[in-house]
Amino acid sequence: MRYIYTRELKYELLEVERLFRTALAPWSSEVDCYLVRLNNDSTWQHLPGIVLSAYHFMGLDKSFSIAMANIFKNLYFAQSIHSWVRDDEEGQEYNQDLQFSILIGDYIFGHVLKLLVDIQATSLLQDFLPMICTINEGNVLKHKFAISEIEVLQKTRVPLYSTAFITAGKLARLSPERLKIYGQLGYNLGMAIELLENNHDQEADQYIHDSISLYEEFS
């Protein structure tokens, strides 16, 4: 599914991609195999634009919004790399590829921390850490307990969207009541996008309706 972005947002997305690629340039040949795996990944495609939109709607600085979109892009990349590492029961081979997967994933997490320091936003770690824990829990449930596809999306994808809205709302100093609404908007929007992208159109209808209602309530 294609989403229509304004011309300005398209330019900002290009800048996010430039920042992302520049940081990984020393390992470009090594990480290409991971990036190829994300070519058709719906979250990979849509998350940066959603983050930018969430931050712009709060009236936050453009350069800061771009930096945050890059941070979320890096977080999702690192989480994806780590999620592809299997355990012994799943036939994981202990070789250089495994070592690099772990190292590059850890490096990117460290890079995210540096980016937060650079923009003086380390306070957001209190929101990122629970998000990462939820995603990790979702990956474990996915591989060990065979939960439904929708439950997997709720645990491993949607927390990125809701956290984007919550962090934007906190930085904009929303009241607790309005912050809760804005976070719910991010959650429902994320569920709608991910369900539509994974051909769960009927299940997405309620989340689309709730997103519209929350947007109207917030506005």
What is each stretch, according to the model?
Residues 1-219:
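All-alpha prenyltransferase/terpene-synthase fold signal
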